[in-house]
Swiss-Prot record:
Interacts with coenzyme Q. PANTHER family: COENZYME Q-BINDING PROTEIN COQ10, MITOCHONDRIAL, SPERM PROTEIN HOMOLOG. Its main location: mitochondrion. Belongs to the COQ10 family. The gene is coq10-1. Keywords: Membrane, Mitochondrion, Mitochondrion inner membrane, Transit peptide. This is Coenzyme Q-binding protein COQ10, mitochondrial. The keyword DNA-binding does not apply.
Length: 205
C-alpha cells in the first residue's frame, strides 16, 4: 500500500507483460495514474512532463572484481543491506542465460512501491537493470561496470543511474532521495563487501 500524508492508495504490483492492455479505466491503477501520471501512451495529455536525469559515479574499492561483482549481482540479498530496499526476490532465472527477472520493493518514509526489473549481465564485466514497468517511472535504468584497479585486488566500479518520473509531483517528492542514491548504494555495497570479505571500509577516488 502506498501512503502519502493522510492519503492512502492501494498498491498495485507493476508486473505487466508485453502485449497486455494497460489502458485500464477503473480500479486502483486508474486512480494511481490520475494522481501520479498515466502510462497510457495514447493519452496525449499525459505524456512525460519530467526530465530524464542521469547520475554517474566511479569509485575504487579495495576488493577484487569477482568479489565486488558477486555482491552486486545477488539482487535477492539487497533487502538485507540496502537501506531503501524493503524486499528483493528473483522471479525468473533460466540456467545458462545471461539475464533474469527480479522484483524489488523500495520505499522512503511512508511511500512504498514494488516493481519488476530485467537484469542483464556479463560476469565480472557489467550488470544492467531496467524496470520493465512501474507506475512511478517512465524510465529507470541502473548500470554497473567493473575493471581492475590500479593496485592488485582492487576494483574500479562505475555506477550509472538514469531515471524519469511520470509525475512532476513525485519527482519533487523524491528529489532529495535520488540526489544521494548513488552514494547510498555504493557505500552499502562497500560495507557488504566488508561483511563478507574483510573488516576495513574505505574508498579511494
Amino acid at each position: 500500500m502506498i501512503k502519502y500524508s493522510n492519503l492512502v492508495i492501494p498498491k498495485t504490483k507493476s508486473i505487466l507483460k508485453s502485449g497486455c492492455n494497460n489502458n485500464i479505466g477503473y480500479g486502483d491503477r486508474y486512480f494511481f495514474n490520475k494522481l501520479f501520471g498515466s502510462n497510457d501512451a495514447s493519452d496525449t495529455h499525459n505524456q512525460p512532463t519530467t526530465k530524464i536525469v542521469t547520475k554517474e559515479m566511479t569509485k575504487e574499492l579495495k576488493y577484487p572484481v569477482n568479489q565486488v561483482y558477486s555482491v552486486i549481482i545477488k539482487v535477492e540479498d539487497y533487502k538485507e543491506f540496502l537501506p531503501f530496499c524493503l524486499n528483493s526476490t528473483i522471479l525468473k532465472r533460466e540456467k545458462d542465460k545471461n539475464h533474469f527477472e527480479a522484483e524489488l520493493e523500495v520505499g522512503q518514509g511512508t511511500i512504498k512501491e514494488s516493481y519488476v526489473s530485467k537484469v542483464v549481465y556479463k560476469e565480472n564485466k557489467f550488470i544492467e537493470s531496467t524496470a520493465t514497468d512501474t507506475p512511478l517511472f517512465h524510465k529507470l535504468i541502473n548500470t554497473w561496470s567493473f575493471k581492475q584497479g590500479q593496485t592488485p585486488n582492487t576494483t574500479i566500479a562505475h555506477c550509472k543511474l538514469i531515471y524519469q518520473f511520470k509525475s512532476p509531483f513525485y519527482a519533487t517528492l523524491m528529489e532529495n532521495f535520488f540526489a544521494s542514491s548513488l552514494d547510498v548504494m555504493i557505500n552499502s555495497f562497500d560495507k557488504r563487501c566488508d561483511e563478507l570479505y574483510g573488516s576495513s571500509n574505505s574508498f579511494k577516488k
